[in-house]
Regions:
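Aromatic-lined carbohydrate-binding/catalytic grooves of carbohydrate-active enzymes
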Residues: 71-107, 210, 305
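Beta-strand-rich modules
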Residues: 464, 496-519
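Recognizes extended acidic, P/S/T-rich segments that occur
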Residues: 457-501
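Conserved aromatic anchor
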Residues: 441-453
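Active-site-adjacent "subsite" loops/lids of carbohydrate-active enzymes
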Residues: 28, 34-59, 128, 133-184, ...
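Substrate-binding cleft of secreted/luminal carbohydrate-active enzymes
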Residues: 291-317, 331-426
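Catalytic domains of carbohydrate-active enzymes, especially glycoside hydrolases
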Residues: 56-85, 188-192, 302-306
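Polysaccharide-binding and catalytic clefts of secreted carbohydrate-active enzymes
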Residues: 74, 81, 146, 152-302, ...
Length: 529
């Protein structure tokens, strides 16, 4: 009873916070999560090998994906490469230790293949999240597989303190390895996207003759400053990954999630006369510390989206959420790309002045996340609002009955399904419409649509019989209204819920990897179109 009263009180507070929320949620919005495997943060809870461990790991993943489906999440970013390892059978990397307890040990199954399959069963996109460069967070002795020892012997690695170690971004073989790893994932698995996080060069790497990469810089820089030289190598890696994806499966969405502040007047912002720099007090530390220049990736059109980690609240003194969100919305639109914000679950309450620090999200500040979603929607200039939540375990309560951020988001922001924003800068094949759509015993069926390796999904709508086809259309001209959107399916059939099996007509649309939705085909519609 006390938990129910507490949850009710939280909802009242959030309602007061969010009086400005739109009456209807947008049809187009990315809703995603970071599904973290490094240190087994989100998954798996069970570490080991053998039939019992495998069954437990699979069940944990299925339970998690059920939670995400219940929250109307549109994609899951599954971490498949955290420290130059793999959560799948790789030709280039050893198996991760975070699955079995020992690096290089085959678990006897393929978590990425399973995650893709289970996501798609639930109508959720599966994106492969990779850390491109990181090798170790605790020294050279951490990993001792033959693969890792070979990398040490052959000079692949770079560090400034002997503890945090990365692949050397300036080495051609390192760049090629990253491209090859991405290629094997994009070619070998039906992933819908690829996402890099915010780790590039080792933090605080020297920029003088004491630097570990100074000899290479001196021999190959052609007069560039060492900072520009390092950033250029990161930029080249990003471009080569993007080019590979375009040549392989161009409907796979590719983006990066850098630190939140970039494009300031004193760093990269000065390059663009028509793009006002990011105007917050917080520094653009990543530009000269880890040599990350996110605005350059937008300018060079080597990513489809940017997802800066705006892990600060709307009231933060030096890095407030609103102005940073507004800047990235402008920057992404300026260069013809998408901006989806990355949020930190629990960050708001941890930084409230005078508030005691606590583990996990505080129900008293759940409204902060609703305000951030509203900012995304308000500032988008190209109908491409979106959110990626870190870490996804913070979205739902640890115990039955607990209040959770996900409950609040579901009530005020995500109470209808959404489609991801449309990729408008690529030429997509015309997949047309489904054929032979029919309804029998509560199951909608239609012929499968295929076009090479193109991602093909379907949207299913259930519209009350009293609503005409014309009245069911969205006011902004984007097909049928999202309030009638019943499901997204990767299969060419769908079991209707019992409450939707009578009193409705139905529509099925082809929905591709670029998020284009094609002409609806109706079933049991009696009126005029």
């Amino acid at each position: 009873m006390k938990k129910n009263l507490k949850l009710w009180a939280v909802m009242v507070l959030v309602a007061l916070f969010c009086g400005s929320m739109n009456a209807e949620n947008p049809k187009r919005e990315l809703r995603s999560v970071w599904y973290t495997t490094v240190s087994s943060m989100d998954w798996p809870k069970t570490i080991g090998v053998g039939a019992e461990a495998q069954a437990a790991q699979k069940q944990e993943m299925c339970d998690y994906l059920d939670e995400m489906k219940a929250l109307n999440i549109t994609s899951v970013c599954f971490q498949v490469r955290s420290e130059s390892d793999a959560m799948y059978k790789s030709a280039y990397c050893p198996w991760t230790s975070y699955l079995t307890g020992e690096r290089g040990v085959d678990p006897g199954w393929d978590p990425l293949a399973f995650c893709v399959e289970e996501c798609h069963k639930r109508g959720i996109e599966c994106w492969a999240w990779m850390n491109p460069y990181r090798w170790s967070r605790s020294g050279y002795d951490r990993w001792t597989t033959e693969h890792d020892m070979e990398m040490q012997r052959d000079g692949w690695l770079l560090s400034h303190d002997g503890k945090y170690i990365t692949l050397n971004p300036a080495l051609d073989k390192c760049r090629k390895r990253i491209v090859d790893v991405c290629r094997e994932v994009v070619e070998g698995y039906a992933v819908d996207g690829v996402l890099f996080d915010d780790y590039f060069y080792p933090n605080n790497l020297a920029q003088d003759s004491t630097a570990a990469d100074y000899a290479l810089y001196n021999a190959t820089s052609n007069g560039m400053s060492i900072g520009d030289w390092r950033r250029a190598h990161v930029n080249l890696m990003v471009k080569e990954v993007y080019d590979m994806i375009q040549a392989t499966r161009p409907d796979v969405r590719f983006g990066i999630s850098p630190a939140c502040v970039a494009g300031k007047a004193e760093t990269s912002g000065a390059r663009y006369a028509d793009l006002k720099p990011c105007d917050v007090k917080a520094p653009d530390w990543q530009y000269a510390t880890i040599f990350s220049d996110p605005v350059a990736w937008l300018e060079e059109k080597s990513i489809d989206f940017i997802s800066p980690q705006i892990y600060w609240a709307t009231w933060h003194e030096t890095a407030p959420y609103g102005p940073i969100c507004e800047y990235w919305s402008r920057a992404a639109n300026y260069f013809g790309r998408h901006f989806y914000s990355s949020h930190s679950i629990g960050s708001a309450n941890k930084r409230v002045k005078g508030a005691p620090r606590r583990k996990g999200p505080d129900p008293a500040v759940f409204g902060e996340y609703v305000k951030q979603v509203e900012a995304n929607r308000e500032y988008t200039l190209n109908n491409a609002s979106g959110s990626i939540y870190f870490s996804s375990r913070g979205l739902y309560g640890r115990n039955p009955g607990d209040a959770a951020v996900g409950d609040t988001l579901m009530k005020y922001c995500y109470n209808t399904l959404a489609l991801n924003p449309v990729i408008t800068w690529k030429k997509a094949p015309n997949l047309g419409e489904v054929s032979n759509a029919s309804l029998k015993k509560g199951v909608l069926n239609w012929d499968k649509v295929e076009k090479g390796r193109s991602i093909v999904k379907y949207t299913i709508y259930a519209v009350p019989n009293k609503v005409s086809y014309a009245a069911a259309m969205s006011k902004d001209g984007d097909g049928l209204d999202a309030k009638y959107l019943l499901a997204i399916s990767y299969d060419n059939k769908y079991q209707l819920p019992k409450k939707k099996q009578k009193g409705h007509w139905y529509a099925v649309c082809v929905y591709d990897g670029y998020s284009n939705e094609f002409t609806p085909v109706t079933v049991n519609y009696k009126g005029k179109k």
